[in-house]
Amino acid sequence: MRDIRQVLERWGAWAANNHEDVTWSPIAAGFKGLIPEKVKSRPQCCDDDAMIICGCMARLNRNNSDLHDLLVDYYVLGETFMALARKHGCSDTCIGKRLHKAEGIVEGMLMMLGVRLEMDRYVERELPGGRTSVFYQRKNSLRS
């Protein structure tokens, strides 16, 4: 079973360092390359995994833009629970619950797609008893 928080952390690091993002560029035309690129200290996912997660995020944005924005603020921009609570006018506990809901929705979308991400071997969460999920074991046995 994959740990959705680790998946989103890797996606957030990828999105924060992505040069082809869909937001407005903070660098004026003609000045690209004068400012060093962001530090890549956080582990990132590969482009293929990121595109799959971006598809899930696009669907979440279409259906619930508040939860989408919350995930982007937390995982891409790195805002804290307290900063998000001030921004949304609620408690940090409420932010935690909303984040958990948004993470669950993205995890459900990934399960419905039935895709195997390249980062799965790094983000596997052990089940009680030290086992990995049956889904993961079955996928690995098919590859052998």
Swiss-Prot record:
Key word Thylakoid present: no
InterPro entries on file: Phage_933W_GpQ
UniProt keywords, alphabetically: DNA-binding, Transcription, Transcription antitermination, Transcription regulation
MF term (GO), any: DNA binding
Pfam families associated with the record: Phage_antitermQ
Top-level taxon of origin: Viruses
Annotated GO biological process: transcription antitermination
The family this protein is said to belong to: Belongs to the phage antitermination Q type 1 family.
Function of the protein: Positively regulates expression of some phage genes. Bacterial host RNA polymerase modified by antitermination proteins transcribes through termination sites that otherwise prevent expression of the regulated genes.
Name of the protein this chain belongs to: Antitermination protein Q
Organism expressing this protein natively: Enterobacteria phage H19B
Gene name, Swiss-Prot/TrEMBL: Q
